[in-house]
């Protein structure tokens, strides 16, 4: 497979899975092994192409992000300094824990076998939360409280285990804490932006020496495909989120996990 086609495939996998509760990192690791694109450079590329998916969310929720820069009244409660405060509360736990465990995660958890166990663990987590059902206390982004934002941030720490899924951790955590399904999904998407920007920037800073100007076309293809596929995935997911449960994602994960274990054990 040519280098640019490899970049396109990885960008497609990243975009389609980043905001679904199936783990984009897990799928990228598995896909990378299938394409024989592995190692430190591949791992950093898999993190870097998250930027395309991040920008897709910023584009889709541009009004919400614009409200964060409006500091007067009349823009809703999820705006201005209060909006930034809520996002900071959600981002802080995983940011701090991620900085402390970055080297350990890259060295010990970026592999198909550990991803398979994370896929299974995340599936059981989804099924357990679905058994409880959605809450009714929080319905829109303007209803998000500091306690809810921090609680979701604590659940987000589960996603530091590659394969668990940041979306699964935050969406199901929000449901446990009393959110409606649509709010859980939308806040998960919006709150992903600062933490993913931070994680991508930090990883690129740590790994910049691995790349050269010759890699720019490879990166560009991955980022563009990631952006387009994430845009489509988020649009479709939001359309369905109020109509279906998250159980199908759990069954998919439970089906995929043993296949990965059998293939790589």
From Swiss-Prot:
The keyword Cell cycle does not apply. The keyword Cytoplasm does not apply. GO terms for biological process: cell wall organization; peptidoglycan biosynthetic process; regulation of cell shape; response to antibiotic. It is found in: Cell inner membrane. It is a multi-pass membrane protein. One of its GO terms (molecular function) is undecaprenyl-diphosphatase activity. Its EC number is 3.6.1.27. The lineage of its organism: Bacteria, Pseudomonadati, Thermodesulfobacteriota, Desulfovibrionia, Desulfovibrionales. It comes from Oleidesulfovibrio alaskensis (strain ATCC BAA-1058 / DSM 17464 / G20). Keywords: Antibiotic resistance, Cell inner membrane, Cell membrane, Cell shape, Cell wall biogenesis/degradation, Hydrolase, Membrane, Peptidoglycan synthesis, Transmembrane, Transmembrane helix. Catalyzes the dephosphorylation of undecaprenyl diphosphate (UPP). Confers resistance to bacitracin. This is Undecaprenyl-diphosphatase. Bacitracin is thought to be involved in the inhibition of peptidoglycan synthesis by sequestering undecaprenyl diphosphate, thereby reducing the pool of lipid carrier available. Belongs to the UppP family. It holds the Pfam family BacA. The chain crosses the membrane at residues 15-37, 41-61, 85-105, 109-129, 144-164, 183-203, 218-238, 244-264. It comes from the Bacteria. GO terms for cellular component: plasma membrane. It catalyses: di-trans,octa-cis-undecaprenyl diphosphate + H2O = di-trans,octa-cis-undecaprenyl phosphate + phosphate + H(+).
């Amino acid at each position: 497979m040519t280098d640019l086609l490899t970049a396109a495939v990885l960008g497609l996998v990243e975009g389609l899975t980043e905001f679904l509760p199936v783990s984009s990192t897990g799928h990228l690791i598995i896909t990378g092994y299938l394409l024989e694109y592995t190692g430190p450079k591949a791992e950093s590329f898999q993190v870097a192409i998250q930027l395309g998916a991040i920008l897709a969310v910023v584009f889709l929720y541009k009004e919400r992000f614009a409200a964060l820069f409006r500091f007067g009244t009349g823009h809703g409660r999820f705006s201005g300094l209060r909006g930034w405060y809520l996002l900071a509360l959600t981002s802080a736990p995983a940011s701090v824990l991620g900085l402390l465990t970055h080297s350990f995660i890259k060295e010990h958890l970026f592999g198909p076998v550990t991803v398979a166990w994370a896929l299974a663990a995340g599936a059981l987590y989804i099924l357990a939360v679905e058994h409880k059902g959605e809450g009714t206390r929080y319905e829109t982004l303007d209803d998000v409280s500091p306690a809810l934002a921090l609680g979701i941030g604590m659940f987000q720490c589960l996603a530091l285990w590659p394969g668990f899924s940041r979306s699964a951790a935050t969406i199901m955590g929000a449901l446990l804490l009393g959110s409606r399904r649509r709010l859980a999904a939308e806040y998960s998407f919006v709150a992903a932006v600062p933490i993913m920007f931070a994680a991508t920037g930090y990883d690129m800073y740590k790994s910049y020496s691995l790349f050269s100007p010759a890699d720019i076309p490879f990166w560009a293809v991955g980022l563009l495909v990631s952006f387009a596929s994430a845009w489509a995935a988020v649009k479709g997911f939001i359309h369905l989120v109020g109509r279906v449960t998250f159980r199908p994602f759990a069954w998919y994960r439970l089906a995929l996990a043993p296949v990965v274990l059998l293939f790589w054990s």
